Amino acid sequence: MEAPRGWLVISVLAISLASSVTEDVCRAPDGTHGSAGIPGRPGRPGLKGERGEPGAPAIQTGIRGLKGDQGDPGPPGNPGRMGYPGPSGPMGPAGLPGLKGTKGSPGNIKDQPRPAFSAVGPNSVSRDNVVVFGKVITNQENVYQNNTGRFRCSVPGYYYFTFQVVSNWDICLSIRSSRRDQIQPLGFCDFNSKGFFQVVSGGTVLHLQQGDQVWIEKDPSKGRIYHGSEADSIFSGFLIFPSA
């Protein structure tokens, strides 16, 4: 145990001596900076920074360049929506006649209108000189009015009208028709200087529309018709065929 204690004493003395020597040495002034050394190697790339704020638009100072060449056509687009119908075009030329159709079934004549009338008289003469044949013999479809002496068309078509009037005086009669508010007369006259009984007759074919009227009219100064039991005057008419 004596040896370790001796080494401890020696160590303490050595430290004390070194401290004394250091305190006795004078401190020298600092030296000047030396020349720059050689640049070191580039360091490793740093991390990617955040995106910066947009820059202000630049002021265009150059001259606008020429128009470039036309680019290649792009791919076709999708079909658009259907538009509104356009106006009707002009009528085209007539086509070729079609084939002849098959024969139809026979019609029923009973279902066809057959206007016809016949009346005798006269019973009277109206103020407008219309001869009224008041005694009706036939009045199919009720087309003749025996109180006015007028036929009224109910079926458009072609009609035949006739009259036979007995007189022993000069007489002038006319078949008159109204169509579209226009009066169309057809006159017949007979002169009797001897006072014998004679028959004045007339007839015509008329194309009538629905609502047209036909009647017999006398001349105011030459229209004396015989009234008696020996002879009758008659006014008749009927449809020949209807209009297509």
Curated annotation (Swiss-Prot):
A family per Pfam: C1q
List of residues that carry 5-hydroxylysine: K48, K67, K100
SMART domains: C1Q (SM00110)
Region (Disordered): 28-94
Compositionally biased spans, kind Low complexity: 79-94
Disulphides: C172-C189
UniProt modification remark: O-linked glycans are assumed to be the Glc-Gal disaccharides typically found as secondary modifications of hydroxylated lysines in collagen-like domains.
SUPFAM superfamilies: TNF-like
GO cellular component entries: collagen trimer; extracellular region
Residues involved in Ca(2+) binding: Q198
Keyword presence, Signal: yes
Modified residues (4-hydroxyproline): P39, P45, P54, P57, P73, P79, P85
GO BP term, example: innate immune response
Compartment list: Secreted; Cell surface
Domain Collagen-like: 31-109
Domain C1q: 110-244
Activity control: The C1Q subcomplex is inhibited by sulfated molecules, such as triterpenoid sulfates, heparan sulfate, or chondroitin sulfates.
Keywords for this protein: Calcium, Collagen, Complement pathway, Disulfide bond, Glycoprotein, Hydroxylation, Immunity, Innate immunity, Metal-binding, Repeat, Secreted, Signal
InterPro entries (UniProt xref): C1q_dom, Collagen, Collagen/C1q_domain, Tumour_necrosis_fac-like_dom
Signal peptide positions (record): 1-22
Residues bearing carbohydrate: K48, K67, K100, N146
The protein's assembly and partners: Core component of the complement C1 complex, a calcium-dependent complex composed of 1 molecule of the C1Q subcomplex, 2 molecules of C1R and 2 molecules of C1S. The C1Q subcomplex is composed 18 subunits: 3 chains of C1QA, C1QB, and C1QC trimerize to form 6 collagen-like triple helices connected to six globular ligand-recognition modules (C1q domain). Interacts with CR1 (via Sushi 24 and Sushi 25 domains). Interacts (via C-terminus) with CD33; this interaction activates CD33 inhibitory motifs.
Role according to the record: Core component of the complement C1 complex, a multiprotein complex that initiates the classical pathway of the complement system, a cascade of proteins that leads to phagocytosis and breakdown of pathogens and signaling that strengthens the adaptive immune system.
Domain notes: The C1q domain is the ligand-recognition domain, which specifically recognizes and binds the Fc regions of IgG or IgM immunoglobulins. The collagen-like domain interacts with C1R and C1S proenzymes.
Annotated PANTHER family: COMPLEMENT C1Q SUBCOMPONENT SUBUNIT A, EMILIN ELASTIN MICROFIBRIL INTERFACE-LOCATED PROTEIN ELASTIN MICROFIBRIL INTERFACER
Record-given protein name: Complement C1q subcomponent subunit A
Gene name per UniProt: C1QA
